[in-house]
């Protein structure tokens, strides 16, 4: 309800803002895009007779870097995030290091609950102009904030060649060097420009993906091969079912991720940030859904919604009903590890690999985890100072390495793999005590596979709907006509997207 009210507030403010801008134009007074305010759009259930929010466009304006870049002004930069004590401790160490270079840039680091809590608080504060300088974000968060152009674009900052003086007597260019740009894992970096206008709104901070966890002890004992394609996955499930008829061979945590990833692997349409947004009702997508329905009917799989909890619980189970494979977040590796006994021994060894692909060379795995965005402010020096801080954290190999080891998330830089401490961390990788290192190692090995989906006001609705669609199609009574049931389910999902998006 709160999100819905804020959505209405936002739509009204956009209309008033447009009127005000028109009036200013008539009076030959330039409109200041930095003064626009916004609240959150409702991605879950807006009435269609409510004002339709605008889509983000280039009219939001590309941030113009001051001629002198950072002028040494004393500023306080507020950073909203979700870090617990262990990660905040790492951050604080690097804030201190940053302040040795820029003592007049004071960082106010604030933990704001969950990712959704950050989104909701920022959205509320945008309506009254008290938003922070920097915030953890996901793409759909930025799409909401951008309904009124609240997020500063980063393109001019990234490309700036202005030389900035630091307190230790050294200098750096304000923007990114070619070497720094090239060090980012491509899929993580590309996420910042997926909003339909070609502009860069976010920088990757720390990331995760989905990986395939499997019971290595069971696989080795039964001569099973780890599936690398979906065809091999079906064969593996069949063999496991023969060996253990009570098992559910595969658990998949995120129905939405599964659907979207299959679209990426097939190269079929899902959504678009511009034009017609909801494109997922097509023959290719209906076909793979039908295939997974057949797997479900054979008892090969379950999902988080169907199981009623994360499928890691089924994977680590020592009861009669268990799974031997689980597809879930790379950042949750320790939850995929069974409990050790009193002597520290685990009931089985866990293996980790890339999720199955189609075998068509179009390998894709989802990019997840927080990015950071910078908000527009009246004082351009706050934006520039915010950029310097974000640049410092996202290009620091030492910070990325230490943060990754503490968090279980994956660093966003390729070169972190060569960091001595991180290389030692990866060298310990195993399917027991150091399972987080094994997960990170797999993630780094598949750095060319990462994808992100278009972000727009309504993209989270599409995500929810395709997840619900997959669940429904696995279990629904088809009345003897599976194709008709699936077609209707797709049509209904599109209608829900158009109504609520």
What name fits each language-model region?
Residues 97-183, 217, 221-225, 316-325, ...:
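Extracytoplasmic "Venus flytrap"/periplasmic binding protein-like
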Residues 50-69, 140-209, 349-356:
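Hinge/lid segment of periplasmic solute-binding proteins
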Residues 66-68, 84-106:
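Short, polar/charged alpha-helical segment
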Residues 73-84, 105-110, 134:
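Short, well-ordered beta-strand elements
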Residues 100, 106, 128, 198, ...:
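Extracytoplasmic/periplasmic substrate-recognition and gating elements
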Residues 1-76, 100, 491-501:
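Short, low-complexity disordered leader/linker segments with a strong preference
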Residues 42-47, 52-57, 220, 430-432, ...:
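Conserved C-terminal helix/tail region of periplasmic/extracytoplasmic solute-binding proteins
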Residues 236-239, 276-306, 355:
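Glycine-centered hinge/linker elements that transmit conformational signals in sensory
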């Amino acid at each position: 309800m709160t999100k819905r009210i804020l959505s209405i507030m936002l739509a009204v403010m956009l209309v008033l803002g447009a009127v005000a801008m028109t009036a200013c134009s008539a009076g030959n007074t330039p409109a200041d895009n930095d003064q626009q305010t916004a609240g959150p759009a409702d991605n879950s259930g807006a009435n269609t007779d409510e004002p339709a929010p605008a889509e983000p466009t280039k009219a939001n304006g590309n941030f113009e870097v001051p001629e002198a870049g950072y002028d040494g002004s004393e500023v306080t930069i507020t950073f909203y995030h979700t870090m617990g004590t262990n990660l905040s401790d790492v951050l604080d160490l690097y804030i201190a290091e940053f302040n040795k270079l820029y003592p007049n840039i004071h960082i106010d680091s604030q933990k704001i609950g969950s990712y959704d809590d950050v989104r909701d608080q920022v959205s509320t504060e945008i309506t009254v102009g008290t938003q922070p300088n920097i915030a953890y974000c996901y793409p759909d968060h930025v799409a909401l904030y951008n309904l009124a152009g609240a997020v500063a674009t980063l393109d001019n900052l990234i490309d700036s060649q202005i030389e900035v003086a630091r307190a230790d007597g050294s200098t750096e260019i304000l923007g990114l060097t070619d070497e720094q740009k090239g060090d980012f894992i491509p899929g993580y970096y590309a996420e910042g420009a997926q909003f339909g206008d070609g502009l860069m709104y976010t920088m990757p901070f720390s990331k995760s993906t989905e990986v395939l966890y499997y019971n290595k002890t069971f696989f080795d004992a039964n001569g099973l091969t780890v599936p690398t394609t979906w065809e091999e996955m079906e064969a593996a499930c069949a063999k496991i079912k023969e060996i253990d008829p009570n098992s559910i061979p595969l658990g998949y945590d995120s129905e939405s991720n599964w659907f979207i990833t299959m679209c990426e692997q097939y190269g079929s349409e899902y959504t678009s940030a511009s034009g017609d947004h909801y494109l997922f009702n097509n023959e290719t997508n209906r076909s793979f859904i039908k295939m997974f329905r057949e797997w479900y009917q054979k008892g090969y799989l379950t999902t988080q919604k169907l199981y009623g909890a994360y499928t890691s619980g089924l994977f680590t189970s020592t009861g009669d009903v268990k799974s031997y494979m689980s597809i879930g977040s790379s950042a949750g590796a320790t939850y995929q590890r069974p409990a050790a006994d009193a002597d520290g021994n685990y009931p089985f060894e866990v293996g980790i690999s890339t999720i199955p692909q189609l075998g068509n060379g179009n390998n894709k795995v989802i990019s997840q985890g927080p990015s950071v965005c910078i908000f527009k402010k009246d004082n351009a020096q706050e934006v520039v100072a915010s950029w310097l801080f974000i640049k410092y954290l996202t290009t620091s190999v030492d910070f990325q390495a230490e943060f990754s080891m503490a968090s279980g998330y994956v660093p966003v830089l390729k070169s972190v793999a060569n960091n001595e401490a991180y290389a030692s961390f990866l060298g310990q990788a195993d399917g027991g005590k150091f399972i987080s290192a094994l997960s990170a190692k797999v993630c780094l090995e598949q750095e060319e596979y990462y994808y992100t989906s278009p972000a727009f006001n309504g993209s989270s609705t599409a995500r929810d709907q395709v997840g619900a669609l997959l669940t429904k199609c696995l279990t629904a009574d088809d009345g003897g006509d599976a194709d008709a049931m699936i077609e209707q389910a797709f049509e209904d999902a599109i209608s829900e997207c158009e109504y609520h998006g």
